[in-house]
């Protein structure tokens, strides 16, 4: 059995990579992927804590987080496609206004 601390360490590492992706990258698609990485690392931590306590409530919360993340991706990608059609770029620095 893998110790709980390894899962928490992996979750922290993945969350750190996600934060670095949000802070360093300027591409909107990479920003979305970095946010999803952070959400999934939080899910890993929640499942790990639920497994350590032998409680199913953490897994239920993770299910709802996955549902909300899927809705966020659907709306975010739809907005990104609409912005790309008008601006012809996905660079966040160049997409500074919502006017056409």
UniProtKB/Swiss-Prot annotation:
Keywords of the record: Cell membrane, Membrane, NAD, Quinone, Translocase, Transmembrane, Transmembrane helix, Transport, Ubiquinone
Gene Ontology terms, MF aspect: NADH:ubiquinone reductase (non-electrogenic) activity; quinone binding
Enzyme Commission no: 7.1.1.-
Main localisation: membrane
Mitochondrion among keywords: no
Gene Ontology biological-process entries: ATP synthesis coupled electron transport
Pfam families: Oxidored_q2
Keyword Transmembrane helix: yes
Annotated Gene Ontology cellular component terms: NADH dehydrogenase complex; plasma membrane
Protein's cellular compartments: Cell membrane
Database matches in InterPro entries: NADH_UbQ_OxRdtase_chain4L/K, NUOK/Mnh_C1-like
Bilayer-crossing regions: 4-24, 29-49, 60-80
Catalytic reactions on record: a quinone + NADH + 5 H(+)(in) = a quinol + NAD(+) + 4 H(+)(out)
Membrane topology: Multi-pass membrane protein
Role played: NDH-1 shuttles electrons from NADH, via FMN and iron-sulfur (Fe-S) centers, to quinones in the respiratory chain. The immediate electron acceptor for the enzyme in this species is believed to be ubiquinone. Couples the redox reaction to proton translocation (for every two electrons transferred, four hydrogen ions are translocated across the cytoplasmic membrane), and thus conserves the redox energy in a proton gradient.
Family to which this protein belongs: Belongs to the complex I subunit 4L family.
Alphabetical list of PANTHER family matching this protein: NADH DEHYDROGENASE SUBUNIT 4L-RELATED, NADH-UBIQUINONE OXIDOREDUCTASE SUBUNIT ND4L
Subunit structure and binding partners: NDH-1 is composed of 14 different subunits. Subunits NuoA, H, J, K, L, M, N constitute the membrane sector of the complex.
Protein name listed in UniProt: NADH-quinone oxidoreductase subunit K
Species per Swiss-Prot/TrEMBL record: Roseiflexus sp. (strain RS-1)
Record lineage: Bacteria, Bacillati, Chloroflexota, Chloroflexia, Chloroflexales
Gene symbol of the encoding locus: nuoK
């Amino acid at each position: 059995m893998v110790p709980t601390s390894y899962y928490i360490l992996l979750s922290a590492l993945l969350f750190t990579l996600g934060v670095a992706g949000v802070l360093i990258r300027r591409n909107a698609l990479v920003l979305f992927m970095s946010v999803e990485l952070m959400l999934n690392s939080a899910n890993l931590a929640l499942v790990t804590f639920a497994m350590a306590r032998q409680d199913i409530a953490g897994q239920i919360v993770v299910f709802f987080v996955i549902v909300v993340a899927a809705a966020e991706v659907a709306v975010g990608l739809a907005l990104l496609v609409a912005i790309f059609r008008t601006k012809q770029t996905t660079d966040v620095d160049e997409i500074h206004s919502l006017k056409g």
